[in-house]
Swiss-Prot record:
It comes from Teredinibacter turnerae (strain ATCC 39867 / T7901). The lineage of its organism: Bacteria, Pseudomonadati, Pseudomonadota, Gammaproteobacteria, Cellvibrionales. This is GTP cyclohydrolase-2. Residues 172-199 are annotated as: Disordered. Belongs to the GTP cyclohydrolase II family. Gene3D superfamilies: GTP cyclohydrolase II. One of its GO terms (molecular function) is GTP cyclohydrolase II activity. One of its GO terms (cellular component) is cytosol.
Length: 199
């Protein structure tokens, strides 16, 4: 893993002014970024969201998933606290890529759930890798976090990278009639920590 920090810039948003920090991975040719707000230094745990790219949810406002709602909720939560970071990883479709995600959606249209669709295409249920986070966390000076997540794999990944998780903050939002089956599959087959009747 060859992660290199590139540059930072201001990013005005509907939730206030963030700093955007660019990183490149020479092994995968992917570009990742961190959105940060406030001073991340010190011993106090930093409010953090690990968010994998979802073009359909983040940019096209798809209701098939909860990704866009989760991203916006994380930005809002950080703006209220005045301090935090979102690690935005270019791992579209739980790591299978955009076109394969469309293929998976096609299978879901025919009745497969999100896990069955991935497996029918020859992929694992979740192909994401989080190893790039270690140098990104080091660059940002973050070693202790309050992690906004429902996904136990992210918790395990950060612990494995030596990140101290002071607290897990449930991050349920965006449930609607179009994604309720998807969310139940994430809870039942992927072990996500969901209540099942969140808003």
């Amino acid at each position: 893993m060859a992660i290199e920090y590139v540059e930072s810039s201001k990013l005005p948003t509907a939730w206030g002014m963030f700093e955007m920090h660019g990183f490149t991975d020479s092994e995968t040719d992917k570009e990742h970024l961190v959105l940060s707000m406030g001073d991340l230094a010190g011993d106090e745990p930093v409010l953090v969201r690990i968010h994998s790219e979802c073009l359909t949810g983040d940019a096209l406002f798809s209701l098939r998933c909860d990704c866009g709602a989760q991203l916006q909720a994380a930005m809002h939560r950080i703006s209220i606290e005045g301090r935090g970071a979102i690690f935005y990883l270019r791992q579209e479709g739980r790591g299978i890529g955009l076109v394969n995600k469309i293929r998976a959606y096609h299978l879901q249209d025919k009745g497969a759930d999100t896990v069955e669709a991935n497996e029918a295409l020859g992929f694992g249920a979740d192909m994401r890798d989080y190893s790039m986070l270690k140098p990104m966390f080091e660059k940002m000076g973050i070693s202790r976090v309050k992690l906004m997540t429902n996904n136990p794999r992210k918790i395990d990944a950060l612990i494995g990278l030596g990140i101290d998780i002071a607290e897990r903050l449930p991050h349920e939002t965006g449930r609607n009639p179009h994604n309720s089956h998807y969310l139940e599959t994430k809870r039942g087959k992927l072990g996500h920590l969901l209540e099942g009747d969140s808003e």
